[in-house]
């Protein structure tokens, strides 16, 4: 264990953290919850790592970092990349005897009648045992799991579920029932952090060329951490640049800066982040602006089926919060099991992930959300503009905005002043739709970064 002093004159502010219970804060769909600590300091940023560092920075609190924390953040991002680029990783994670087809792994529990009673760690171990028999690179199962001296059953299982998510495009899983920071404490041994570096190298061995530089930069960061354990005072400037806040955008907006951001490969919209990394000149940055809410939650969601049920359950694992132990902030890993009570997106009546939908006029008639076509969510006959003058719509156009992953409903018609255009921007969530904004604008605005998926003309006016 090493203690790195960044500023011994920095006095801790008189802060009384507000703690909330993770078991009371999570989505109602969650039916099983396991955390290292279910009491988390109240969250303000989607990603717990960034939230904790920001909280420490703002309140002059020391933080405690484990190899597990780094590895889970890195592994969940790498797993996301594999899931989005599965064709590049088929040779590693597909069934070696049947690589072009999805293989179902079924685990039976005759002594249990519901998911809540099943020991999830046992379910995961049985899944991994089956994967060990099927995949070519089964050595990755152990190489990529949390096995540091700081690891515990929760962080180990979190990393193992992330591995299951990597193989998710080639395997399906089914459960069959009987029915400002003053100091940083680096937990673990130097061998643990060397082990972290070895795991990053393992990812480098199988990574595609698009992300090799990202992993190489992470290896450089890990080397400096290892040196810091041996010689805590050598890389103080490096640690001071781990995290800081800058003004960005307009007004008083701020955003995260520092090399901690290099643990992220994608933002929450699954857009690949650009990095500026110059270790020699100590330049560590993200290209462009990444606002607090742009950081993704450190979580993977691995679907599995139960018996003959049509809707999937999900194994969710990641980092869910942070707590305070001996005046140091520490992250909380965990895993949950959830079951959706709606169908989400489907294509040809088969469940699919929203990111894989090909929004186009050719495929539009085959895309549904919760069993309904997109235009069926709205039956618009008339719209009121901002001057409260009603007009008739003779043209309804629906766009999928590729930048914001939202649906734009455009209504064109006429009022006494001439042609008008009104819109509603919606998000599909929790089995329904939520209007995020509405107003009037020129149609050309919506064409940018959008794909037209539906157009209907009505020859009658109401």
Curated annotation (Swiss-Prot):
Pfam families: DUF4419 (PF14388)
Protein name: Uncharacterized protein L662
